[in-house]
Amino acid sequence: MLNYVLKRLLGLIPTLLIVAVLVFLFVHLLPGDPARLIAGPEADAQVIALVRQQLGLDQPLHVQFWHYITHVLQGDFGTSMVSRRPVSEEIASRFLPTLWLTITSMIWAVLFGMAIGIAAAVWRNRWPDRVGMTLAVTGISFPAFALGMLLMQIFSVDLGWLPTVGADSWQHYILPSLTLGAAVASVMARFTRSSFVDVLSEDYMRTARAKGVSETWVVLKHGLRNAMIPVVTMMGLQFGFLLGGSIVVEKVFNWPGLGRLLVDSVDMRDYPVIQAEVLLFSLEFILINLVVDVLYAAINPAIRYK
């Protein structure tokens, strides 16, 4: 297992290098001139040229790329074109709000999604199944920004129970986490139901029932563990999606996280911040997939030897 983990970690290097090349080319293909945006609408051509020189944008593209990649390999992601702060500081100040929002969203999404999925599988083709799957389809189909605005209108504007924007207290996490986790809970519910339906028809489940074991214990002990392997895969993918896909929710709730930072950076063509964030999101996905593979071995020890 240790050798497998080390090989996967070494595989990070070429993957991240490819991502670094692609994101560098992508940001330089974006329309708009960062120097003009930073200099302001009133700036003349001389001022814009001076700003472009200060940012290093007057150099040939291959020179810019070499400067960028050599600094990245040294752990230096440059300086933000807008704030003039190191990119690492910009990301560090926004990382924790996004991480806590993601964890909060994932916890309730997994709990509710798995509960709905298990209930739908156990009472298949009956009213719990129909109600649960209707809710799941609705959660997947409803756009996140629309759900966020609806929740704000009801619980913040009309009822005045919860704050609308910011991340100062635990109450600020409720509406954004519900909005962000709704689609994930829906996916988890459908995936858990599908996995459990297959498990419930296995021979060992019928054997456990024949021995007189209660249905609740059969489902929780024998069914849950064997149904968890594909569900864990989906959990890992969805966690990565939440970390990198919270852009819309963070924008709606004015959340001080990485998603909003990325949107603001794209608006201002802040190349160093965009490049660093995309690399960070790629690294997160790779590490999450590695953690999922390790969790397989914890759930089913037989996988360790394959």
From Swiss-Prot:
Any one GO biological process: transmembrane transport
Domain ABC transmembrane type-1: 95-292
UniProt-listed CDD domains: TM_PBP2 (cd06261)
Membrane-side (Periplasmic) residue stretches: 30-102, 156-168, 250-278
InterPro entries hit by this protein: BPD_transp_1_N, MetI-like, MetI-like_sf
Subcellular location: Cell inner membrane
Membrane disposition: Multi-pass membrane protein
Top-level taxon: Bacteria
Ranges of the Cytoplasmic topological domain: 1-8, 124-134, 190-228, 300-306
Transmembrane segments: 9-29, 103-123, 135-155, 169-189, 229-249, 279-299
GO cellular component terms, semicolon-separated: plasma membrane
Cited PROSITE patterns: ABC_TM1
Pfam families: BPD_transp_1 (PF00528), BPD_transp_1_N (PF19300)
Coiled-coil intervals, chain numbering: none
Keywords: Cell inner membrane, Cell membrane, Membrane, Transmembrane, Transmembrane helix, Transport
Major localization class: membrane
Physiological role: Part of the ABC transporter complex GsiABCD involved in glutathione import. Probably responsible for the translocation of the substrate across the membrane.
Protein family according to the UniProt entry: Belongs to the binding-protein-dependent transport system permease family.
Assembly mode: The complex is composed of two ATP-binding proteins (GsiA), two transmembrane proteins (GsiC and GsiD) and a solute-binding protein (GsiB).
NCBIfam families, per the entry: PRK15081.1
Name of the protein this chain belongs to: Glutathione transport system permease protein GsiC
Species in which this protein is naturally found: Salmonella choleraesuis (strain SC-B67)
